[in-house]
């Protein structure tokens, strides 16, 4: 059984928020050592070992309806759009941020000041067929479309992704696009094969506190706010997910751009006017139906959570960030509660939101560990760093990627 499946079941069945430093080795020892890899150094493994699904290309004439169906039904994170039918040149990509932007234009829940958006909105109201390309080329904060050859090592890929780039395209021997390699896919591969890489095992017992990663530059929304407000906030800020909190700043759940798929059907548009707290229950129900059980991922970790537990949770939840919340056993560092409102300072509550840890943070740690520049465990309180790219932060002090790969 894959480590991710086993660890996911273990996390949910035990109901634990972390496994301690002393139990990490015992936990990892349950699983066999993979024997099908060409090296015991993860950074030397070819990127082709991340290949788990084919790339899906669309052309400039593909309608929004068709592109959205491909994106959702195939469970993809993005669709490259070729410059013209039959071309290998990539013009841009279509993703959930574009789908969210389109939905807001359709229902009129955003005030688009940009004249280009107004033109598309007018075409929508006139009943014209809108293409995915028309919407995608209006997208905000898009990564450059980067391609790397199939011979690229995971170490080089980690260098690229630690800069905050979320995904790259991998080409085959003929130079044709083969598949997408993402931050999430490299983390999933390393976690599933962790026993094959003994150099990583000492890192697994380090805590979020000792690694000093994360950011207090968090974006959240109240549970009583409407879903439309959450989608609008993500569209305007360019971030990929929001923490949903109650009046005491306690974490209720997470709404991400991917969750826009639950409101794209005409029968579910009414959810846009429901509260975010209600929407969380809808998401839980939908995910439970797909998983065949009444369960939903928990997107929170503690400062005391180990790196191993954090990886396991990222793989199990398939999310792009985890919310750092107050542990029931440890008080937060003064710096971590500086953003809390004066009314909430009478006593920091369990599950109170403190910060966010992103995939970029995690890959930055892996890259720094590979380079030998990861600082040793500190003895002082952690200081969460203010992030970049929305709520994402990274160790710029020990992760300075020079991205010079081919950009299309």
Curated annotation (Swiss-Prot):
The organism's place on the tree of life at top rank: Eukaryota
Chain positions covered by the region annotation Disordered: 376-408
Record key words, sorted: CBS domain, Cytoplasm, Nucleus, Phosphoprotein, Repeat
Matching Pfam families: CBS
Molecular function terms from GO: protein serine/threonine phosphatase inhibitor activity
Phosphoserine modification, residue list: 77, 329, 333, 341
GO cellular component, one term: nucleus
Function of the molecule: Required for normal DNA replication and for proper mitosis. Induces sexual development and ascus formation.
Family per similarity comment: Belongs to the SDS23 family.
Name used for this protein in its record: Protein sds23/moc1
Species whose genome carries this gene: Schizosaccharomyces pombe (strain 972 / ATCC 24843) (Fission yeast)
Organism placement in taxonomy: Eukaryota, Fungi, Dikarya, Ascomycota, Taphrinomycotina
Gene name, Swiss-Prot/TrEMBL: sds23
